Curated annotation (Swiss-Prot):
Residues annotated as signal peptide: 1-19
Organism phylogeny: Eukaryota, Fungi, Dikarya, Ascomycota, Saccharomycotina
Keywords attached to this entry: Signal
Signal keyword on record: yes
Species assigned in the record: Saccharomyces cerevisiae (strain ATCC 204508 / S288c)
Domain of life: Eukaryota
Name of the protein described by the UniProt record: Uncharacterized protein YDR246W-A
Length: 66
């Protein structure tokens, strides 16, 4: 599944990063998807806090991180 996330992110999720004009269009569904991903995440709270900080610059950074 990790490989699938990486594949999807490379085509659909990265355009939502800041600096692209499409961000305003994808910001709401991107945030909703990120919340659902965090909800089922089994990572440690410390690591999630780091990802929460990084998500301010790119919502899908946690999906790209091994």
């Amino acid at each position: 599944m990790r490989r699938l996330y990486r594949h999807l992110a490379s085509f659909f999720l990265l355009p939502s990063c800041p600096g692209n004009t499409i961000q305003s269009i994808t910001s709401y569904p991107a945030n909703a998807l990120l919340r659902s991903f965090r909800h089922v995440s089994t990572e440690t709270p410390v690591r999630n806090r780091v990802h929460n900080r990084d998500s301010q610059s790119c919502p899908f950074f946690p999906l790209m991180d091994d």
